[in-house]
Each structure stands twice: as C-alpha cells, then as structure tokens.
Regions:
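Extended, C-terminal/distal alpha-helical "rod" segments
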Residues: 63-176
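Surface-exposed, charged/polar loop-rich segments
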Residues: 1-65, 76, 145-148
C-alpha cells in the first residue's frame, strides 16, 4: 500500500489531464474555442508545452467559455484546474522527474547502435531522476525520500528483468 500512496498524485494528475483533454476534444464548441486560441495540438508532447498552457488559460478566461453553458459544472472544474498553479506545478514536477526515463527509452528505441551505452545511460538516468525528486523535496543526497525509494525500486526491478549478459559484454568492450 505504501508504494501506491507515494505514486497516487501522479495518477490523480493523469486522470485530471485526461478529463480536461477529453472534455475539450469531445465537445465541438470547446475544441473550436481551443483552436481559436492555439494552433498547437492539444496536450501533445512537445517543446511548446508552455504555449499550450497559455492558450488553455486564455481560453477558459474568455467570455466565450463563460457564455457556453453546456455541462457548466465540468466546465467550471476544468477552468479551476487550468488556472491552478498547484496543479500545473504537479504536472511540471512529474514531467521533470520522468523526463530522464522518457529520454532513455527514446534513445534506446532507435536504430542507432547503443547496446554498449546502456549501463552508463541507465546509471545516469537514475541519478537525474534522483536529482529532480530531491531538488523538489528540498532534501540532501544522503537523506531518505519515500517517493524516490519507490521509483528507484521500480527502475531497478525493470533493469533486473531486462538486463542480460550482452549489456555487460558491450559495456566492457566499449573503447573509451
């Protein structure tokens, strides 16, 4: 139970983000409003995340958002989330500490030979995740972080499951 309680905030943000995206995407008028305020794809992974946030905020504070009365309670909830600095702070935090994991997966999932780099990349990824979590929590490297412990255990379990002798051999034979 301890593991899930540490990760619950991630699921809550994911559920809210999915609800916001679906609310806008599944209502023609709301989608039209979003497209009016932004020429970006809604909530797609991009370096233009900030522009999407600004567009969403402009959309929900516009007169058109207030005038359109379909599903007013959900619209109000969406507006509160989009204007919430706390919610966006959680989104940014999750993106910061999962970014090294995402980058590692993206790099390893290419046609570029990288087997010889996996050990060092994995260690580097874990250190970057730790750095982001500890920075956010205001902890020193020698202190204990419940969230980091849970994520570390997940990453190590994944490494143990996927690690094979070829990684070790490739790492050993890599000329530096």
């Amino acid at each position: 139970m301890h593991v899930w309680s540490q990760l619950e905030f991630i699921n809550n943000v994911k559920v809210e983000a999915t609800m916001i995206k679906n609310f806008i995407m599944n209502h023609g008028m709301r989608l039209s409003m979003f497209n009016e305020f932004s020429h970006l794809k809604l909530l797609s992974i991009a370096e233009t995340r900030f522009a999407s946030v600004v567009s969403l905020q402009h959309m929900v504070i516009s007169d058109k958002w207030s005038i359109y009365k379909e599903d007013a309670s959900t619209a109000q909830h969406v507006k509160e989330k989009i204007l919430s600095d706390v919610w966006w702070g959680n989104v940014e935090y999750i993106l910061r500490f999962t970014s090294p994991i995402y980058d590692m997966i993206r790099f390893a999932d290419t046609d570029t030979p990288c087997l010889h780099l996996i050990y060092e990349m994995w260690d580097s990824m874990i250190e970057k995740v730790k750095k982001e979590i500890y920075l956010h929590e205001g902890k020193e490297p020698n202190e204990e972080s419940d969230l980091y412990s849970v994520i570390y255990d997940i990453l190590i379990a994944r490494w143990t499951k996927g690690n094979n002798p070829f990684h070790c051999l490739a790492h050993s034979l890599n000329p530096r």
